[in-house]
Amino acid sequence: MFRAQQNAFDDAVAKATDENLTSENWEYILDVCDKVAAEESGAKDAVAAMIKRLAHRNANVQLYTLELANALAQNCGPKIHRELASRSFTDALLRLANDRMFANNPDFGIMEQAYMKLKTQNPNLQPPSKPGKREITEADRQKEEEELQMALALSIREKPSAAPEPKAEPSTSVSEPASQTQTATSQAVPPGTSAATVSRVRALFDFQPSEPGELQFRKGDIIAVLESVYKDWWKGSLRGQTGIFPLNYVEKLPDPTVEELQREAQMEAEVFGQIKNVEKLLTLLSTRSSELNVQDNEEITSLYHSTLSIRPKLIELIGKYSQKKDEFTQLNEKFIKARRDYESLLEASMAHPAQPQYGRPGQAPYGYPGPAAPLGYPQGPPQSDPQRYFSPRPQDQTHMYPPTSHSPDPRGRTPPAGPSFPQHQQPPPDSYQPVHHRPESTYDNPQELGTSVYDSPVEHPSSSQRLPYPPSGAQVPPGVHQQFQHQQQEYPPSGYPPEDASKPPAAGFALQPPQQTLQQPPYPTAPGAHQPTPSHQPPPVPSTASKPTPYPSLTPGTPSGGEYQAYNPSQAGAANSNPNSYYR
């Protein structure tokens, strides 16, 4: 009987916000704006028509209605502003959007109140600001460690208590903590929570990294927590990527309880139990003729309804196992990369084995201590007169092997003629002495300082005397020993004066290399005069009188007036016919 008056703007607003439009039709929108501006009650009627369109279930209709309201607010002046700021229109916008152009106008306070109401009731509409990156203090790390130890102790305490419980009532002690955990962790991660007690978090908002090292994620992603990095930032892993993320963008996920695991297992069993019904339904549908009425067949209908109930569970399981598949794929890729790195390092180490530092392992190079150097060295007899023997300073003994004495064999043994080559002989372990000891000759008794360039030999205590080892690197030209043996039959030993100590002993003798000279401390004939030690046999004991020299001098470079004269012993020494008295 009482029929509501039809709104004149319903058709125009419906035409401008038609759901079949692919985009905004500004021709229809401007027609509505012109009509509102032309009529006195046009603003009120247009807003009422838009409120109806906002209640439409089609999202395109809602978007076109909001665009129409925006166009009216910009083109129709204060009248339409008052209508748009009314409580009826703002209530319709509470779950859609808000118009920011009313924020600073106190006349339209209802719209501002609606905006604040949206912010307070729905805080998750906009993501929060990122917290600052503050370093974790030592107290925070200690607290995190304490929480971890406490959680481990609680888990160990709960396992023995849960074992003797009967299966009939397993949820009495587990359901209450699980419900409390779920209610406590439904919100964002609390400030006091540490990464040691949280294994997974769920993203509440989309996060776009602004700095390198931050983890990108979308709302709903499950992030695996690794460790705490900053005060309000944790490190996590998602889809093979590792980075840090803010805590106010995520919420803590509790570990699944026993009831949840049993529920998931039961759901999976139900889904897999319906596989045979699905296969049977497919078989019936494929074997029946097309003329068969499916609605009249009760078997097909019952099978269809029974299998239709597992569809949401099946979709959930597909998502669950798809995520597990991605996780296992990423784990496999990491394992393959780690195995390849290990194999490459192993091949590199096998291709380049460790080389010994000095020479062969069985023989140490000359001038370096061998592995058995400090063992088994003989010590010299006690010294009766330290002034009569040469004792080098400790700083001069920088080599492990002592200088080899080049005193000849008193029995007159001469090496065979021929070219001699430098060679390394392995001396017996007891023929050398350690560093910083007085050098000794190859004989057992100490040796006096000689009065000529040749060392004075000492008498052998026994016939089993060891022969000296030639030094490493010393070269003796062929024919030198024969030449000198021929000369020593005619000449007595001669010495160099102190002023000519720097001259070479003879042109026919091979000089020692610098290293060999340094490793053989000379025996000076006078203070301050250092003469190299020759490597040949000394001449025999001189006779009582000096004979003329029919042969040229050993130093042909010196003039005839400065030739070296033969040593003339004193008359007292000549009267002594015992040759051994000369060496005392």
Curated annotation (Swiss-Prot):
Residues 132-144 have a biased composition (Basic and acidic residues). The gene is hse1. This is Class E vacuolar protein-sorting machinery protein hse1. Component of the ESCRT-0 complex composed of HSE1 and VPS27. GO terms for biological process: protein transport to vacuole involved in ubiquitin-dependent protein catabolic process via the multivesicular body sorting pathway. It comes from Aspergillus fumigatus (strain ATCC MYA-4609 / CBS 101355 / FGSC A1100 / Af293). Belongs to the STAM family. Residues 16-151 form the VHS domain. Component of the ESCRT-0 complex which is the sorting receptor for ubiquitinated cargo proteins at the multivesicular body (MVB).
